Structure formats: C-alpha cells, structure tokens
A protein has these predicted regions:
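Sequence context surrounding c-type heme c attachment/ligation sites in exported
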Residues: 10, 27-139
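N-terminal positive-inside, membrane-proximal cytosolic segments immediately preceding the first
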Residues: 1-13
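Hydrophobic membrane-insertion alpha-helices, especially the h-region
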Residues: 10-27
Length: 139
C-alpha cells in the first residue's frame, strides 16, 4: 500500500513543482511586471531607482546617436565605432537581474537587438568604413 501511495505522491509533487517553475518562467522571463494603460500601451512597473537607470540608459542612446552623427559628419569612422561600441551588448550587462525580471520578453528582445545592432555598426565602421553604410544601418 505504501509503495502505491509513493508511486502517486511523487509524480504529483513533481507535477506541482513543474507548474510552479513554469509559472515563474512565465512571470520573470515572458510577462515581466507590466500593466496595460488606457491608451493601449504596456507600462513596465519599476522601482524609482530602476526607472532612473532605464531613463539613464535611454539618454545614453540619444547621446550615443548624437556622437555617431557628429562623427559621421566629419567622416570619423573611428569615432563612429567608439560611440557605437559604447552602446553595444556589453552595456546590456549593466542591468540588474531583478530589474531584468520585470521587463517583458518583447522589451528584452528589442533591447538585446538594439545593443547587438550597435555592435554591428561598430564592427562595420572599423571594417567597411563607409559613412553611407552606417547611415543606412541607423535608418
């Protein structure tokens, strides 16, 4: 009798644990900490310090784009590469894991794609070194 009970309890425990893990994966990798706004957008719910970090990151992109534009206007492809590399994938590692869990999957995909795109711009600026090519990548 006890063997039969064990044979039923263990799979049930495993199933419950798998459901808990699946729920956590959905919450922290797919959904994040979000809510719908009345205008249909998705708001990411962050603590004030996390919000400040996110805004700093966005300002960094604007500043980096300004640096790239200025370097392009001077045909300074080394300057383009330097500015683009500063916005590349290495910068994505600055985001704390707790904050990363609050970001929805679509946002994470966009962020990693954007950082990767700037790495590509940096590499192409060094190897291809054509300002028009870089402008095409930015558009």
């Amino acid at each position: 009798m006890t063997g039969t009970i064990r044979n039923r309890i263990y799979p049930a425990i495993i199933l419950v644990l798998l459901l808990i893990i699946a729920g956590m994966v959905y919450k922290f990798i797919v959904a994040g900490s979000t809510e719908k706004t009345p205008d249909g957008r998705v708001a990411i719910l962050l603590e004030p310090a996390e919000r400040d970090l996110m805004l700093k990151e966005m300002r960094g992109f604007v500043e980096g784009l300004q640096e790239i534009s200025e370097a392009l206007s001077k045909d300074d492809m080394k300057g383009v590469a330097k500015a683009a590399r500063a916005m590349g994938a290495s910068r994505a590692h600055d985001v704390p894991l707790g904050m990363m869990g609050k970001l929805p999957l679509e946002f994470k995909k966009l962020a990693f794609s954007t950082h990767g795109g700037f790495d590509t711009i940096a590499m192409d600026a060094e190897t291809i070194a054509l300002p028009k090519h870089t402008l095409g990548q930015l558009s």
